[in-house]
Amino acid sequence: MFQDKGWVLLTLITLVSPSWAAYKLQERYSWNQLDFAFPNARLKEQALASGDYIPQNGLPVGVEHFGNRLFVTVPRWRDGIPATLTYINMDRSLTGSPELIPYPDWRSNTAGDCANSITTAYRIKVDECGRLWVLDTGTVGIGNTTTNPCPYAVNVFDLTTDTRIRRYELPAVDTNPNTFIANIAVDIGKNCDDAYAYFADELGYGLIAYSWEQDKSWRFSAHSYFFPDPLRGDFNVAGINFQWGEEGIFGMSLSPIRSDGYRTLYFSPLASHRQFAVSTRILRDETRTEDSYHDFVALDERGPNSHTTSRVMSDDGIELFNLIDQNAVGCWHSSMPYSPQFHGIVDRDDVGLVFPADVKIDENKNVWVLSDRMPVFLLSDLDYSDTNFRIYTAPLATLIDNTVCDLRNNAYGPPNTVSIPKQTVLPVGPPLYTKQYRPVLPQKPQTSWASSPPPPSRTYLPANSGNVVSSISVSTNTVGPAGVEVPKAYIFNQHNGINYETSGPHLFPTLQPAQPAGQDGGLKTYVNARQSGWWHHQHQG
């Protein structure tokens, strides 16, 4: 039937390749339950007996890498959390389930010792000046059980000396009774003193800016973009349906410095499928807190099942973000329009990436992802005989390879024009200039998995049998009356664009090899092995 037997073999390999072939994130550490590095066995036994340490009550939520240390935060949502800011010595523990070491020491993790310690930390950030930024929420408990023994305080540590070099309490005017801050972004300008931190007030619906040089903070709160979308409060994770309808501004990322000397802050409310943005020129100016409404820009929705809590952008403009409904990590290259065909999925795993709570890119452009099954922990019961918490890593270049986010080898690139910036309510402008790309490839390169050894830590999903595949539906762009394209949002990247369902490549190569008689000749079907985000191409008769 087929004259080219080699083509048949390649197609069969694509269809029946084992599930590990789709994975690029590699598991580095994992735990059934968290363990801590007590000074000695006797003190650990005392903590277990007194309830100061309850292994089943710990949930990791934040991760950050610096040198030979991998930092992990454990909020004090329940009793029995001996330390909230911890790290793994990566020289001593290359893999496995290492004990978490309190940072910088045990005393600095004493709950309620406001001036000297950290009570609860969530997501943290290391800047390029070797400083670790930690916001202590000062809280114990979660939801209705929350108490506030300490005020919100910014803590900054010098990672070369492991000493705290700054503690700044947020003034009462910068918070409100509903304030809950779980995310931080750090903006370094001309030098290490020209530093700002931005804090997302998820339940108080505000954005707080802090100046290192001035040692002062101010709050932006008069903006509806910080609020949840009332239509996007329904969640489905790990088979659990729940409603987080009050969750406002949450995930944030910062662009590289623009030509005007400022960055762009991108952010999303948790109960939303939409991304927003604002220049740090506005956020750095205390006088603009009540007079900046029109300086914030709305991008369109990402599409269904696209809630996100964490995002990060590399210094060359590649944004990674978690997709908690999809057990996946997505990507977008910020030099491209913010539209669905320029969003990709770099990895998906319905076992290992259940609630990928935090995503980071370190100084060496390695990506770190922490998954923790948070909704199961909060709303149901974890099985502590199973692996519940994982930390994955991979080089950024490896993750985006052969995705729409990899512009170095992208046969599915956009038209070589950039539009005049417009708000979403205005028509798309004419081309401003021609954007230069590398020559378009005649055909998307095929990836051969046959010679790749399976990663030993990613073998828990069974392989497909026969030629069974899972299909992915690709949403089309929205059009208005008479086929006119809906105006797209623009934000500091010289493009109009929307964000819809994360999807695979949106265009086919213009040049196709000759096909046997009776075949269509085009690349007709995107298929997805083991529900991963990596696209495998096949010809169908």
UniProtKB/Swiss-Prot annotation:
- What job does the chain carry out? Controls the pigmentation pattern of the adult cuticle and larval mouth parts.
Q: InterPro entries recorded for this chain?
A: 6-blade_b-propeller_TolB-like, Royal_jelly/protein_yellow
Which residues does the record list as glycosylated?
A: 144
Keywords in UniProt for this one?
A: Developmental protein, Glycoprotein, Secreted, Signal
* A Gene Ontology term for the protein's cellular component: cytoplasm
Family, per entry: Belongs to the major royal jelly protein family.
Q: Which cysteines are joined by disulfide bonds?
A: none
- Principal place where this protein is found? secreted
Q: Which residues form the signal peptide?
A: 1-21
Q: Where in the cell is it found?
A: Secreted
GO annotation terms (biological process): cuticle pigmentation; male courtship behavior, veined wing extension; melanin biosynthetic process; regulation of adult chitin-containing cuticle pigmentation
- The coding gene here is y
Record-given protein name = Protein yellow
